[in-house]
Design a protein with these regions (language model features):
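Helix-coil boundary and interhelical linker segments in multi-pass alpha-helical membrane proteins
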Residues: 9-34, 78-93, 140-159, 166-174
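Juxtamembrane helix-capping/reentrant segments at transmembrane boundaries
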Residues: 57-70, 120-125
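Membrane-interface helix-loop junction between the first two transmembrane segments
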Residues: 45-65, 198-202
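Transmembrane alpha-helical segments that form the membrane-embedded catalytic/substrate-channel core
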Residues: 41-50, 99-113, 182-197
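A hydrophobic membrane-anchoring alpha-helix module
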Residues: 166-213
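Membrane-proximal helix-loop-helix units in multi-pass membrane proteins
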Residues: 92-162
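Core segments of transmembrane alpha-helices
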Residues: 69-82, 129-139
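Transit-peptide-like, low-complexity N-terminal presequences
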Residues: 1-26, 30, 196-213
């Protein structure tokens, strides 16, 4: 029977998301789970700080803040899928599309902010990191399941799997809870706060009252 990433390797802790084919797979998984994903929070929270320092609510305003929420969503959903479901054609495609959508919204974000809000060199470097992270994560996932990636383009002998399949064995509960808590604390909370702060000041989105005659 074919050995694949989803098969169980009893020599490896269940902290790993699924079975392993080689030491390279172990290294790739650990790079994704313990390096790429945790480090992703650093430029994310730094970018929020730069927005706050330049008073986004009084400059570029609600529209730019909305693009930030859309970018987080475009890559957040595929990442969540990789934590709970086997890596297959569906998950890989969602990550690729999410990365492309994130890049497109990022371009729109910078284009809109230009001339409305000061974007310092350090913020530009922060943006570069944020744009690179989704593609890095996607590349690691593709390397872990190259046959499913190839099957998307009708290459190789493996059929693409286009349904969500629960991970066997699952990533440890502690890791998933910890990462989701970090997402809530360092992504959802600050960027929701930013959006609400912009809404409170943006008069264009408030309902206009008809003057009483």
């Amino acid at each position: 029977m074919r050995s694949r990433v989803g098969d169980v390797d009893e020599s490896v802790s269940t902290d790993e998301p699924s079975g392993l084919r080689s030491d390279q797979d172990v290294a790739l998984r650990r790079a994704l789970l313990y390096v790429i994903l945790p480090l992703w929070f650093v430029p994310g929270i730094a970018d929020w700080v730069w927005h706050r320092q330049t008073k986004i609510e009084r400059t570029a305003g609600t529209f730019e803040s909305l693009t930030h929420l859309l970018m987080k969503t475009s890559v957040g959903i595929p990442i969540i899928l990789t934590l709970f479901f086997d890596i297959n054609a569906l998950v890989i495609t969602s990550m690729m599309l999410g990365s492309v959508v994130h890049e497109g919204i990022s371009f729109l974000d910078v284009q809109y902010a230009d001339g409305r809000r000061e974007v310092s060199p350090i913020e530009q470097h922060t943006h570069s990191l944020l744009e690179m992270m989704p593609f890095m994560a996607t590349l690691v996932v593709v390397c872990l399941e190259p046959r499913q990636f190839a099957s998307i383009f009708r290459l190789g002998s493996e059929r693409p799997r286009w349904k969500l399949e629960a991970k066997r064995p699952a990533i440890s509960l502690q890791y998933r809870v910890g990462l989701l808590c970090a997402v809530a604390l360092f992504v959802i909370a600050p960027y929701t706060e930013e959006f609400v702060r912009c809404l409170r000041i943006d008069d264009t989105l408030k309902p206009h009252r008809t003057p009483e005659s």
